[in-house]
Amino acid sequence: MGILWDSFLLLLVSTFALFLVRILLFKTGLIYMVKLWRRKIIDWFHVYQFYKVPEFNDNVQENHLYQKVYMYLNSLSSIENSDFTNLFTGKKSNEIILRLDRNQVVGDEFLGARVCWINGEDEDGARNFVLKIRKADKRRILGSYLQHIHTVSDELEQRNTELKLFINVGIDDHLNKKKKKNGRWRSIPFDHPCTFDNIAMETDLKNKVKSDLESFLKGKQYYNRLGRVWKRSYLLYGPSGTGKSSFVAAMANFLDYDVYDIDLSKVVDDSDLKMLLLQTRGKSVIVIEDLDRHLSTKSTAVNLSGILNFTDSILSSCTADERIMVFTMTGKEQIDPAMLRPGRVDVHIHFPLCDFTAFKTLANNYLGVKEHKLFSQVEGIFQNGASLSPAEIGELMIANRNSPTRALKHVINALQTDGDRRGTGRRLLLENGSRKSTSEDVSDDMSGSLCGGGGGSSPAVKEFRKLYGLLRIKSSRKSGSFDVAREMRDG
């Protein structure tokens, strides 16, 4: 009986001790250490193989597999079990998104086999993912597992309709190597509300631009048959505030493309620009704004020929297909027409100051007004030559959006001020012209009396011939330029 009692007490004490050990393990980090030791012991009995997926290939172009692995891993529930995970706010304020941190491990299972992914980073800052898989499982699951990643990431990409705006960063000397390895693009969500439905533009021109873009979207086989790169380029030119940037946003929303906004002030030279363009993805709109301003101020070592040569050079065939390139300028008169020939720039679209048709579109968009008793007065002022940019008129309407009548009166006052300014300018020009012509007449009379005739060789006639020759040169240059926007309007 005593032996049984002793055995019972020993069992009771052992059970209590195990219970205390269990509590100790779960309440402290010892359980983590036990799991870690267990994993290391198992690893001693298995041979593993490692596969690295770098973010960029040897040509510094984006590795699409890296992006697919990135999307796939961040969708795994096991990311919560990683030792270090980043938390971000999602689209909704109460939504929390988990992202794997650098040099952290996340586990996954496929067809009964366990694999691990390491979010790595090399010494030079190049990012990568490393797949750790048992050699015994490699032949059985590797191919189908990678295909599984492709399938899941494609489904995630289709559900994620968020567009992105990519911005290039500059090269700092102490981070030169690292930034080149990591890429020079940084992205933010692109949610610009502008569309072709609410943009102020002539209806016929808008419809023809939309038709041109739709033809481009369906043109992959056509471009391949012609042996041309599947891309298209646009030149948008006109004064500031006429809607060029809004038009780019409308294009991106219509095409459902990401946007790459190139800041030339952060580009070192033509070679650096080419490397930037090589790192862009397909299905994107690549924008270089205010091109003439950058070139005139010499704020960058990039030149116009270097930019436009890329669009029709052999190197452009090495980049992703299905891209739209857009250049914006305030005017193209100072640009050599050969620089803007077809093949380099396919479509030229002029953005003029606001006219009455565009004004009615703005009034409808900003004020919800399609007709108003003051419209006839506004139309008359436009017909007299007054004009403002759509941005200026839009700001007046926003400031007075609670009262359409007050907003229209402010627009009328601004237009009248502009008309008076233009009228004063024309009068001064006419007065200066009449004074100049009078002085030239006196000069001709004096030269005739002194030289005994010979009016054909007088300085005034020479100046007139020189001016006439200059006008002929400018006229010939203008007639030789290729402007699809004008063709669209005439057609």
Swiss-Prot record:
Protein name: AAA-ATPase At2g46620
Gene3D superfamilies: 6.10.280.40, P-loop containing nucleotide triphosphate hydrolases
Organism: Arabidopsis thaliana (Mouse-ear cress)
Cofactor: Mg(2+)
Transmembrane residue ranges: 1-21
GO cellular component: membrane
Membrane disposition: Single-pass membrane protein
Subcellular locations according to the entry: Membrane
GO biological process: response to stress
